[in-house]
Amino acid sequence: MAKKSMIEREKKRQRLVEKYREKRQQLKAAMADPNIDQATRMELHAQLQKLPRASSPTRLRNRCWKTGRPRGYFRDFGLCRNSLREMAHRGLLPGVVKASW
């Protein structure tokens, strides 16, 4: 199980990403406009740099909702491989069957 502080830090990052999503998209769209001059583009870039570092979606890390484990993450379930295996064996994941061929 991951430390509670790491899980909370990740939740804080998710809140920051949501809070600044619109502003970040607007700034990036304005910077991508080919009709603006270089000085305006530099000003937009400076505004983008002033946003909190943790508000960038790149800094998010997928974590298991059950254990908080950051590695071996399955997006379809939101679980790490260990929790996925355990829950599948118990029959807690609908539609998941043990493979045989």
From Swiss-Prot:
<dbReference type="GO" id="GO:0015935">
    <property type="term" value="C:small ribosomal subunit"/>
</dbReference>
<protein>
    <recommendedName>
        <fullName>Small ribosomal subunit protein uS14</fullName>
    </recommendedName>
</protein>
<dbReference type="InterPro" id="IPR001209">
    <property type="entry name" value="Ribosomal_uS14"/>
</dbReference>
<keyword id="KW-0699">rRNA-binding</keyword>
<comment type="function">
    <text>Binds 16S rRNA, required for the assembly of 30S particles and may also be responsible for determining the conformation of the 16S rRNA at the A site.</text>
</comment>
<dbReference type="InterPro" id="IPR018271">
    <property type="entry name" value="Ribosomal_uS14_CS"/>
</dbReference>
<dbReference type="GO" id="GO:0003735">
    <property type="term" value="F:structural constituent of ribosome"/>
</dbReference>
<dbReference type="GO" id="GO:0019843">
    <property type="term" value="F:rRNA binding"/>
</dbReference>
<keyword id="KW-0694">RNA-binding</keyword>
<comment type="similarity">
    <text>Belongs to the universal ribosomal protein uS14 family.</text>
</comment>
<dbReference type="GO" id="GO:0006412">
    <property type="term" value="P:translation"/>
</dbReference>
<dbReference type="GO" id="GO:0005737">
    <property type="term" value="C:cytoplasm"/>
</dbReference>
<comment type="subunit">
    <text>Part of the 30S ribosomal subunit. Contacts proteins S3 and S10.</text>
</comment>
<dbReference type="InterPro" id="IPR023036">
    <property type="entry name" value="Ribosomal_uS14_bac/plastid"/>
</dbReference>
<keyword id="KW-0687">Ribonucleoprotein</keyword>
<keyword id="KW-0689">Ribosomal protein</keyword>
<dbReference type="Pfam" id="PF00253">
    <property type="entry name" value="Ribosomal_S14"/>
</dbReference>
